[in-house]
Swiss-Prot record:
It comes from the Bacteria. Its EC number is 6.1.1.4. ATP binds at K621. Belongs to the class-I aminoacyl-tRNA synthetase family. This is Leucine--tRNA ligase. InterPro entries: aa-tRNA-synth_I_CS, aa-tRNA-synth_Ia, Leu-tRNA-ligase, Leu_tRNA-synth_edit, M/V/L/I-tRNA-synth_anticd-bd, Methionyl/Leucyl_tRNA_Synth, Rossmann-like_a/b/a_fold, tRNAsynth_Ia_anticodon-bd. It is found in: Cytoplasm. PROSITE patterns: AA_TRNA_LIGASE_I. GO terms for biological process: leucyl-tRNA aminoacylation. The keyword Metal-binding does not apply. Gene3D superfamilies: 2.20.28.290, 3.10.20.590, HUPs (3.40.50.620), Isoleucyl-tRNA Synthetase, Domain 1 (1.10.730.10). Its main location: cytoplasm. Keywords: Aminoacyl-tRNA synthetase, ATP-binding, Cytoplasm, Ligase, Nucleotide-binding, Protein biosynthesis. The gene is leuS.
Length: 859
């Protein structure tokens, strides 16, 4: 055996073995239990970052653990390779997105291989290839045929100077990133998929996701946002028009003092003809990119329209205001305002001098709305015939009256909106729809799929090449001239079904149902919690679409979800001569000084600049505090990086990158290597004979099997990889102190090392592969079984009992494991230390906690 641990040499040899033997390639096997382990696939940005490494190490640990459980394990990888960053890079590098993307894929693929991840590379997919997006296009046409796809106008960011649509990322301080022209909101036709048709099922099935984090489930419930309420009709005074409003608080209807409508509401447009102030306000709102999320913090503003709404019960007239906090694309575009019982309405009413009336009060007292709205549920008053009713009775009575008079209906609403999948970008899958000469819009016929995205293009930074090239759109369908859709799919489309394509990546159909139903659902999915409400919801939605198309037979795409925390690193900067911050990589910090609590108080970089330390923050390009995984692998080896990633923090919490911790992980591997090297050079001919073991040998063997039990539970059930590593480290400490003088000493250490290399195999597979062979095993570690606990080894011949006198530990005694209270008490009382502390006292009570504690109370 090689005496020194040389990671680069070992890892290259082991990775070559895996590659040559196609170790991780799998096929369906009805005789084996399957396990599908999947980490969210990366965008090929150019280089892996530590966030990737953490995600993929967790996935690899789970996959390798399950493999040693004897399961048929699928762990695939691919590339989420469409998207705006490729367009921006192509513009900056004067190239096309395709070659930039494919070069990055090759580079990052090699990085993944260097880290030793056990992927089935034969299933690799890239979503930007026609072989992949062809089936996405095909499926979209099927959804259209089922009535689940439609087209309507929706607002986009529009640069009037370049006459092009901008992504949200391309709007900087309300202006175009390229020409600094103020951005407008423009309504253009776009394609939508009816996710709302599945809202109820998506919500209800959250209750079946037992293996998903509660936080993700709560976020999805809130995002779907089911509410029960009443949709009611308000008339418009002096007009033959009416409009609808939805509310979840009909009990407050008698307190409505004004109505707020979106600036884009038809009533606002009508009123603006004779109201210049309102017309200007509408134009201003049109050009603001207010998202629903920003509404909570923005200044609430409005303009009176001059119109009045007719209260559906009292007939009273209340003013209609156009307000910037009402969105036309959310609900009906109008809200009833009850400033006495809604804080936003209260503040708006105070600002503009509108009436505030209280109609709800606490059950046991009066209500004061002089300083703030009373927003709790309570008892109705000032509400005419409804006075004295509580929330539920008031809700029902008012709802029933509105329904009976034909002025309203009970309704279940969802916050969830239909999925807009159109993007006015180039680097995405073309939407497979065509417009015939007579204006009819139809799906592209199946025999004309895929609609190919041309890859040999020139990016001018203004318009999508397929929009600029008028010839590209021209086609023929059934002998008629037609024009192709020039929008491309939202890239969430590709990531919504990739997990299923891995099951049959080379099939000449979207999915091979037999293969898909063997592997699906995914047993373990791993990715960041930031994807909770977008990707993970579309992921679930698409699975139900696939099910209803007869392609899969399960209801949900993944049984278990692990959301790993972010990777943080120290961040430093200095101020340059221009007064700007220059962020310095932690690798370029030459010296640091720390206080007695270990906090950095002073830092100087390699160029002598005194640095400001801003603490730990998420690794990012903007703060230049990302650590290149490749640099760490070259310095310490992949196994060290993997071990640190698993040991430094529980998986769902943030991980603080500390090179001192990486060095500690490296030292541990060297200790393991040294112990194994010493062992293989011993005479190990004597087989383990448990019947001849001394008490010390039994105690050491007990530690081995306790560790097997703990690590098995920590990795397999609890997914607490850090405590699993800690348990093995503790066992290593016992082994290093253990004698190696007899044949049975060596036999126990041999058993322990055999267990340790398998327990650590998921985490440090290269070292484990090598040591497994050095320990004399004929087959490779991938073909071995996870170590099994010997229950007999856990049985203790004796117990160490703590003896307390009046609450203080005074002695520790060893007793037979099956000793009764009387014998333990007798032994404890006869201990010389106990006798000393009982001298002159009378024993009043003795408490025995079996196998742990003897407590003596005396005075």
């Amino acid at each position: 055996m090689q005496e020194q641990y040389n990671p680069s040499e070992i890892e290259a040899l082991v990775q070559k073995h895996w590659h040559d033997n196609k170790t991780f390639e799998v096929t369906e096997d009805a005789n084996k239990e399957k396990f599908y382990c999947l980490s969210m696939f990366p965008y090929p940005s150019g280089r892996l970052h530590m966030g990737h490494v953490r995600n993929y190490t967790i996935g690899d640990v789970v996959a390798r653990f399950q493999r040693l459980q004897g399961k048929n394990v699928l762990q695939p990888i691919g590339w989420d390779s469409f998207g705006l960053p490729a367009e921006n890079a192509a513009i900056n590098n004067k190239t096309a997105p395709a070659p930039w993307t494919y070069e990055n894929i090759e580079y990052m693929k090699n990085q993944l291989k260097l880290l030793g991840f056990g992927y089935d590379w034969s299933r690799e997919i890239a979503t930007c290839t026609p072989e992949y997006y062809r089936w996405e296009q095909w499926f979209f046409t099927k959804l259209y045929e089922k009535g689940l796809v439609y087209k309507k106008t929706a607002s986009v960011n529009w640069c009037p100077n370049d006459e092009t649509v901008l992504a949200n990322e391309q709007v900087q301080d309300g202006c175009c990133w390229r020409c600094d022209t103020p951005v407008e909101q423009k309504e253009i036709p776009q394609w939508f998929i009816k996710i709302t048709a599945y809202a109820e099922e998506l919500l209800n099935d959250i209750d079946t996701l037992d293996g998903w984090p509660d936080q993700v489930k709560t976020m999805q419930r809130n995002w779907i946002g089911r509410s029960e309420g009443v949709e009611m009709t308000f008339g418009v005074a002096g007009h033959d028009k009416s409009f609808d409003i939805y509310t979840t608080r009909p009990d407050t209807l008698m307190g409505v003092t004004y109505v707020a409508i979106a600036a884009g509401h038809p009533l606002a447009e009508i009123a603006a003809h004779t109201n210049p102030e309102l017309a200007a306000f509408i134009d201003e709102c049109k050009n603001s990119t207010t998202s629903e999320a920003e509404l909570a913090t923005m200044e609430k503003r409005g303009v009176a329209t001059g119109l009045f709404a007719i209260h559906p019960i009292t007939g009273k007239q209340v003013p209609i205001w156009a307000a910037n906090f009402v969105l036309m694309n959310y609900g009906t575009g109008a809200v009833m305002s009850v400033p006495g019982h809604d804080q936003r309405d209260f503040e708006f009413a105070k600002k503009y001098g509108l009436a505030i009336e209280a109609v709800i009060k606490p059950v046991d007292g009066d209500v004061d709305i002089s300083e703030a709205a009373y927003t709790e549920k309570g008892v109705l008053f000032n509400s005419g015939e409804f006075d004295g009713l509580d929330f539920e009775a008031g809700f029902n009575a008012i709802a029933n009256k509105l329904v009976a008079e034909g002025k309203g209906k009970r309704q279940v609403n969802y916050r969830l909106r239909d999925w807009g999948v159109s993007r006015q970008r180039y680097w995405g899958a073309p939407i497979p729809m065509v417009t015939l000469a007579d204006g009819t819009v139809i799906p592209t016929p199946a025999d004309q799929l895929p609609v190919l995205l041309p890859e040999d293009v020139v990016m001018d930074g203004i318009q999508s090449p397929i929009k600029a090239d008028k010839e590209w759109a021209k086609t023929q369908v059934n002998g008629q001239d037609a024009l192709r859709e020039t929008d491309t799919f939202d890239t969430f489309m590709e990531s919504s079904w990739y997990y299923a394509r891995y099951c049959s990546p080379h099939a000449d159909e979207m999915l091979d149902p037999a293969k898909a139903n063997y592997w699906l659902p995914v047993d373990q999915y791993i990715g960041g919690i930031e994807h909770a409400c977008m990707h993970l919801l579309y992921f679930r939605f698409f699975h139900k679409l696939l099910r209803d198309a007869g392609l899969v037979n399960s209801n949900e795409p993944a049984k278990q979800l692990l959301t790993q925390g972010m990777v943080l690193a120290d961040a430093f900067y200095y101020i340059n001569e221009k007064g700007a911050r220059v962020w310095v990589s932690p690798l370029d910090v030459a010296t640091t000084e720390k206080d007695d609590k270990g906090r950095i108080t002073k830092a100087i970089d390699k160029d002598g600049n005194e640095l400001v330390y801003t603490g730990m923050s998420k690794m990012s390009k903007s703060k230049n505090n990302g650590i290149d995984p490749q640099v760490m692998v070259e310095k310490y080896g992949a196994d060290t990086v993997r071990l640190f990633m698993m040991f430094a923090s529980p998986p769902e919490l943030t991980l603080e990158w500390q090179e001192s911790g990486v060095e500690g992980a490296h030292r541990f591997i060297k200790r393991l290597w040294k112990l194994a090297n010493e062992h293989v050079n011993q005479d190990n001919s004597e087989a383990l004979d448990v019947s001849t073991l001394t008490s010390d040998q039994k105690a050491l063997r007990r530690e081995v099997h306790k560790t097997i039990a703990k690590v098995t539970d920590d990795i397999g059930r609890r997914q607490m990889f850090n405590t699993a590593v800690a348990a093995v480290m503790e066992l290593m400490n016992h082994l290093q102190k253990a004698p190696q003088t007899t044949g049975q000493d060596n036999a126990i250490i041999g058993e322990a090392l055999s267990a340790i290399v398998r327990l650590l195999y998921p985490i440090i597979p290269h070292v484990s592969f090598n040591l497994w062979n050095e320990l004399g095993n004929a087959s490779n570690i991938e073909d071995s079984q996870w170590p099994v606990v010997d229950e007999a080894a856990l049985v203790e011949d004796s117990k160490l009992i703590v003896v307390q006198v009046n609450g203080k530990v005074r002695a520790k005694i060893t007793v037979a494991a099956d000793a009764d209270k009387e014998s333990v008490e007798a032994l404890g009382m006869s201990d010389e230390h106990v006798i000393k502390y009982l001298d002159g006292l009378t024993v009043r009570k003795v408490i025995y906690v079996p196998g742990k504690l003897l407590s003596i109370v005396a005075n």
